[in-house]
Amino acid sequence: MDAATNVKDVITVKQGLAGRLRLNRPRALHSLNRQMVRDMANALIEWRDDPDVRIILIDHTEGRGFCAGGDVVGISQDVDGHEAAARAFFFDEYRLNHLEYTYAKPGVAFMDGITMGGGVGIACPCRYRVATERTILAMPETTIGIFPDVGAGRYLSRLRGRLAQFLALTGARLDGAECLRLRLATHYLPSDRLEEAKERIIAQPFRTQAVLDELSEEFIPEARIMGNLAKIDRYFESDRLEDILDGLDAGAADGDDWARAEAATIRAKSPMACKVTLKLLVESPYQLHFVDEMRMEFGIMVRLIHHPDFKEGVRALLIDKDNQPQWRPTNPQVIGDRDVEAFFAPLPVEEQWRPFDF
């Protein structure tokens, strides 16, 4: 709730034959807080058996972002004084992600603008994911000392080649055309056609696929990332951070400016978070169901938010904004396999994440 205006941060409303989830926190780029994820989950639960709701639409009310992720500044502050609140945010957020993933009614996410972190988490479970010329999608969590969560281990590890490792380590930003080509989006619409698409879907949800097909852009811009696939597969072949950096350094020494830039990007991230991320991408394909993925991610997250890199990353990027994080440790070589594996140990049964029990 915005105390100044008494306006809710997410608007949940039935309209026509649709249930609408409208993110409404523009001054924070619609970043998610605990009340928002609880409100969205409660609405979805209410609409599960409502015959008047045939489809779910997820979008934002105004501004340049669909959803910039979770409210990590608030979470980092909670870790010190209200640790239970920090855990509760991820517990509830992952419940929303799982509820969407298993929801019987189709969903449409309009990823118009910045779509990062938690924004990816509420968009990717939807059957229809609409990108535009304004879409900027990324999972930049290693910048703040954590890892791509909200089911990203599952979504990223299903991409071709070594794209998962590249995107997760670097936090590289994808535009709408790249999202479409990589199948993170199902459709690419000009932003000036979105309102027409929503109106037609609300009126005739059974024609959602046809409506999006009819309004899709005929001429899609080039997906620039496709030109770097061979380099991504070569340089990011290993599951060891040290090997990846050594390979990029060797490429840079041979005059590859792309390799030089990506090596510098990764070295600016938390070494611990990067190593945990690579381990996640190894383990995620072995999680048979989405519930298993979310349970694993919760166990990792509730430990990693207590590592000093999380608070330091949030400070450097979002509070002081000096972009000079002091990681602990700074050298990935001193982080052993056992250090990383400790984050993946199962939590005690009473502390484990659980989905909604219907």
Name every feature range the model reports, one short phrase each:
Residues 189-269:
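Amphipathic alpha-helical blocks and their helix-capping loop/short-beta junctions
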Residues 58, 71, 122-123, 178-179, ...:
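Hydrophobic/aromatic residues within transmembrane alpha-helices
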Residues 1-59, 98, 356-358:
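Conserved CoA-thioester-binding segment of acyl-CoA-metabolizing enzymes
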Residues 245-251, 258-299, 305, 309-311:
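Substrate-recognition/cap regions that form aromatic- and gly/pro-loop-enriched pockets
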Residues 151-208:
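Contiguous mid-protein beta-loop-alpha structural module that forms a pocket-lining wall or clamp
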Residues 300, 308, 312-358:
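C-terminal amphipathic alpha-helical interaction region
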Residues 100-144, 166-172, 176, 187:
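Glycine-rich beta-to-alpha active-site loop
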Residues 60-95, 143-145:
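Glycine- (often His-adjacent) and acidic-residue-rich active-site loop
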